[in-house]
């Protein structure tokens, strides 16, 4: 009874069970918010929650990769996890803890925190993708 989360920016539900994901950085113009894979950022980290324990797996490889989280049906095996990378080594880190927070803290200890810039840097930010779709974009 595992529940999978993570993988960075992905379309669809936050719970990733029963799906196969392609992970590579891609400018997915006009993507479908329910089903498009891949999107702009990928983080090859899954956080798994069970009733009694949480654990995370970080695949330390940023080449294009695929992760199956129970999508493939097999007559001989129950649902399973499968990771495949286009290139590079298979270095991975396993984090365990009672709570999701414990696993997240362990992952952050390895990868580092996101640092926020100074308040003055948080000025106006606009997206040109939105502007080009506007009927008055040329005005």
Task: Identify what each model region corresponds to.
Residues 1-119, 127-130:
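Catalytic and substrate-binding clefts that recognize carbohydrates or anionic sugar/phosphate headgroups
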Residues 133-139:
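Short, acidic/polar
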């Amino acid at each position: 009874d595992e529940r999978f989360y993570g993988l960075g920016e992905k379309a669809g539900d936050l719970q990733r069970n029963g799906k196969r994901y392609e992970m590579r950085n891609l400018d997915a113009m006009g993507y479908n918010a329910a089903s498009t894979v891949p999107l702009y950022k990928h983080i090859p980290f899954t956080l798994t929650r069970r009733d009694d324990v949480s654990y995370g797996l970080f695949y330390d490889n940023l080449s294009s990769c695929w992760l199956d989280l129970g999508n493939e049906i097999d007559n001989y095996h129950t649902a399973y996890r499968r990771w495949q990378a286009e290139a590079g080594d298979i270095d991975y880190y396993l984090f365990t803890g009672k709570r999701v927070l414990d696993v997240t803290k362990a992952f952050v200890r390895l990868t580092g925190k996101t640092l926020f810039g100074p308040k003055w840097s948080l000025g106006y930010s606009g997206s040109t993708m939105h502007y080009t779709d506007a009927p008055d974009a040329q005005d």
